[in-house]
């Protein structure tokens, strides 16, 4: 059983929801990332979402876009991020780590090399924001060879047919984007998100996590009432800039 499946199973038996925290690899400088990951786990984070720095993060708002800029300026690249996971695994073999990023750096490295290296370093899954399921078959074949999960996005605009299509291909968990916009944007509509999540959960047993717009304890608690995981990005990343 994968680390993600094990963790979600443990939380379900404890009647708890997962706290998934995003951190940009190498932000604000490379030496901070691994100690920060351990501190996050000690503080109660259940799943780590490690951002891969990219120069054109089209789905990210200003907070995470600036984090990517700082990481790139500090010299962190995709392979460096994988090595950070490898170092993290020297002390933590249990906390799931999911990579979140964009397709271009992965294609540059090559699917086989990227996935095999990520697996060897202790990565559990990947979410590429700009890779839709219709174009993900080649990567999926390689991920399955290494028992790694491929996570996909669903949004408020996703049709019922789209939901059915995506849940058939996803593994690990479904990432529901609760807002129409970039990360860290706007105000969360809890009622709409709850309705959409219910539709997704009616189609699959895969856990559903909610991200985008989770900015405080109130919104996290509200989403934890309807989803299996609460994903916090910008609200955590913003103070990291001062480390």
Place the predicted regions along the sequence by residue.
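N-terminal small/glycine-rich loop or linker at the start of catalytic domains
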Residues: 6-28, 61-67, 88-100
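Glycine-rich phosphate-binding active-site loops on the catalytic face of alpha/beta enzymes
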Residues: 45-55, 123-127, 132-135, 176-184, ...
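Glycine-enriched alpha-helix->loop->beta-strand junction motifs that scaffold or abut catalytic
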Residues: 44, 118-124, 142-150, 168-176, ...
